[in-house]
């Protein structure tokens, strides 16, 4: 697949589309992540595993060895066909092993972490970017090429029909009638290769309750004594989160102290695919059928609906996008899943903590002082919750007033080598600094400004 780069689409458009279209009565419905990838199931020889981008080797460890391409985990999220159960929506498979997808084992830190990484990215795309993006796009700048000015943030396939994609994105629910002959346009699959996690000292927040976390993996063992401000973690390898904590009690009764742990994660090599889905309604619930492909039974109907709405022939039923890197703030509190016995029977030799949430690193606000969307532009945003209509309306107002600041912020946070200094995090919750100072303070690498990188 060949790609061409479209410059300067802000982070708010790095994905598409949650069902919450303002024109529909179901605008507050929380969609499950629309990720289904069926091609991976199992290939004993490993020959097709190299094509699985979600678990392929990272850019720094690319190898032609098929065995290496079978390491790690791949996650798919089930598509809803009725009532969505958020506690039973993901399935996991370990590459190189036989068998079907299985639920992630929360007692295995590497599975739990991978699931949360994947789920956090997908939640970010669906719940905290897409709906504001649509509103912003349609109201302020209704053109792909006109949005932003600062960086190459997204890459489309060369055969993209820009007008067609714009219509699909801006009218993500194509309503043919009041029955079951409607089509939804949204995220079909999402894959990524690896993630960078910064050193402990750089991601400790100013709060006294923040605790240092040591992340160990096979990829790091050989360089534990080497200072590296952006250690690269290969998600094919096991990642263990071990937390050094204050404890109370004795023996097996020792418990980790409470506290918030945060790590900045820069996700790399992202590919997203968007497609149409046949939809219908069951009372107030949305039911999803199969994704439309070039030769699926519903393709003809989709093309008829499209032509009736716009008077043009629908050329494509799916679009693949390559996204530049973006960053998540991994947030979790200590949860002991396993206690390893020490040589002297000390039960507190090691405790394993798994993350329990994702947040995205935003500046406190766009204009130094609290604004209408202050609840949205908080330092730590809960991505497990969908933005409300009020939040999105307020956000739009701020975006209209501060478009250039938004563009600068978006360009900066998507750099490949994001480095947040400890001093920058300690000084503020970004409240007293200007946007310019904010960028100068945190987007530096070894004392050099990285803001202009592309």
UniProtKB/Swiss-Prot annotation:
The name this protein goes by in its record: Uncharacterized lipoprotein MG095 homolog
Ranges of biased composition (kind: Low complexity): 55-64
PROSITE patterns (UniProt xref): PROKAR_LIPOPROTEIN
Topology within the bilayer: Lipid-anchor
Organism: Mycoplasma pneumoniae (strain ATCC 29342 / M129 / Subtype 1) (Mycoplasmoides pneumoniae)
Domain of life where this protein originates: Bacteria
Compositional bias annotation for Polar residues: 65-87
Keywords: Cell membrane, Lipoprotein, Membrane, Palmitate, Signal
Lineage: Bacteria, Bacillati, Mycoplasmatota, Mycoplasmoidales, Mycoplasmoidaceae
Residues where lipid is bound covalently (S-diacylglycerol cysteine): 22
Positions where lipid (N-palmitoyl cysteine) attaches: 22
Extent of the signal sequence: 1-21
Compartments, as annotated in UniProt: Cell membrane
Residues covered by region (Disordered): 55-87
Record's GO cellular component terms: plasma membrane
């Amino acid at each position: 697949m060949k790609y061409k780069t479209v410059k300067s689409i802000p982070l708010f458009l790095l994905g598409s589309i949650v069902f919450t279209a303002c024109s529909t009565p179901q605008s507050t419905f929380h969609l499950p992540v629309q990720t289904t990838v069926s091609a991976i199931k199992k290939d004993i020889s490993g020959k097709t595993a190299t094509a699985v981008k979600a678990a392929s080797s990272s850019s720094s460890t690319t190898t032609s060895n098929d065995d290496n391409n079978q390491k790690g985990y791949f996650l798919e999220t089930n598509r809803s066909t009725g009532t969505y159960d958020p506690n039973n929506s993901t399935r996991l498979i370990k590459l190189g092993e036989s068998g079907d997808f299985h639920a992630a084992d929360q007692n295995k830190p590497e599975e739990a972490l991978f699931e949360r990484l994947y789920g956090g990215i997908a939640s970010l795309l669906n719940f905290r970017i897409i709906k504001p993006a649509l509103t912003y796009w349609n109201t302020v700048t209704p053109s792909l090429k006109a949005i932003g000015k600062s960086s190459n943030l997204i890459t489309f396939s060369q055969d993209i029909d820009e007008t067609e994609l714009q219509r699909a994105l801006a009218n993500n629910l194509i309503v043919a009638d009041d029955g079951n002959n409607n089509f939804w346009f949204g995220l079909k699959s999402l894959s990524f290769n690896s993630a960078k996690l910064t050193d402990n000292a750089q991601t400790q927040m100013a709060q006294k309750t923040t605790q240092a976390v040591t992340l160990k993996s096979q990829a790091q063992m050989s360089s534990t004594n080497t200072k590296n401000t952006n250690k690269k973690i290969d998600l094919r390898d096991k990642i263990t989160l071990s937390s050094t904590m204050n404890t109370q009690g004795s023996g097996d009764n020792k418990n980790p102290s409470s506290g918030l742990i945060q790590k900045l994660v820069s996700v790399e090599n992202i590919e997203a695919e968007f497609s149409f889905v046949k939809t219908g309604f069951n009372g107030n619930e949305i039911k999803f059928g199969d994704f439309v492909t070039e030769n699926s039974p519903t393709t003809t109907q989709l093309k008829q609906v499209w032509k009736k709405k716009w008077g043009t022939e629908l050329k494509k039923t799916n679009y693949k996008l390559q996204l530049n890197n973006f960053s998540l703030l991994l947030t979790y509190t200590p949860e002991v899943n396993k206690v390893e016995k020490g040589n002297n029977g000390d039960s507190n030799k090691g405790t394993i903590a798994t993350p329990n949430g994702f947040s995205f690193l935003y500046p406190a606000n766009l204009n130094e002082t609290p604004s209408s969307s202050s609840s949205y532009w908080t330092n730590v945003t809960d991505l497990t919750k969908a933005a409300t209509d009020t939040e999105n309306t307020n956000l739009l107002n701020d975006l209209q007033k501060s478009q250039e600041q938004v563009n600068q912020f978006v360009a900066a946070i998507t750099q490949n080598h994001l480095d947040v200094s400890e001093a920058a995090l300690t000084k503020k919750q970004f409240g007293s600094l200007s946007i310019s100072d904010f960028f100068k303070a945190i987007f530096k690498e070894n004392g050099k400004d990285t803001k202009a990188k592309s």
